[in-house]
Amino acid sequence: MGDRALPTPLGKAAQQVLDFAQAQVQHLITTYPDYFPLYTSGGRWHHEQEAWTNWCEGFLGGMLWIFAMRTGDPWWRERAEHYSRLIEPRKSDRSVHDLGFLFWPTWKRWYDLTGDERIQRVVIEAGRTLALRFNERGRYLRSFLAADSTFIDIMMNTGIIFYAAEQLPDPDLLRIATEHCLTTRRFLVRGDGSTAHEGIFDLETGAFLRQSTQQGWRADSSWARGQAWALYGFGTAYRFTGDARFLATAQQCADFYIERTPAHGVAPNDWEEPHPAHPYESSAAAIAASGLLQLADLTDEPTRAQHYREYAHTILITLCSPTFLAIETPGWEGILKHGIYHQRKNLGVDESVMWGEYFLVEALDRLGQPIRS
């Protein structure tokens, strides 16, 4: 199929996992065509449980693009284009803070492959739409939940605003993305490198009021997926701006993840949760692995870069084992087991989750490859 080799210690195992991932995704899109799942229920993608918010449609298409680019197979390319077109109307969706998650894995990859300016315009429009969520008084992009709220997750979406600012060019878009990152750095990243999920602001004055959480154990605890979003997202902010503050914050968040997580690299849903019933949040680990590979390429300290790269490899070796990979679990439709969507709402707990699938595939694809702008 023309697959690129993976010049890393993971080597053959990584290729086998990508082959398995392709088989699972092929089953998903042929069994449930034009369906965008968020998480499995009992290992099955199709169910009628709550979504909470629709933010995952780009991850399925993103995997299709990775498979198309890795294999050169027109079957994957046709489906990647199809699933990307299905979400195009959301380029003007002002109800969510997740347009980066939707359009960066899909339409941005499509543009990178073709250079077609019509495709690029969709990415730019999504970035401009996301920037409309900016609160000038508080200097933050508001979450989907409320006007006085921002989430650490949004750090993963600011890249599409930076990109739009760069391509147009538009200095106001650059200001918006930069100020949001600085606000998040100041109020959601703590002195020890841990992160809060949510920040609450006074709508009249813009003053920061308090840290909060929707998916962690407590307002002052450390939700693992949010930590992974931060180490990845601040790395991306540094990649676009060259602002050393963002690199330092990404490294601080990465160091906290590594220091607090067991040697195998997979954190629980929240490090402060006492005696968790589910000890693993595999999607946070997959995000962290991909973010650490990016960070290893960004840092100019060789020892630190090697540390991040080796830890990312440790995570991936763990996730590629039968404990986490569904390869030896008959009837399980996902790729990666033991993910958690929303523990408080009991949604997608100890299941496969679509972002966990995507970031595992992205991390494996990233091995040995330079970071992509």
Residue ranges and their predicted role:
Residues 1-373:
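Glycan-recognition and catalytic cores of secretory/periplasmic carbohydrate-active enzymes
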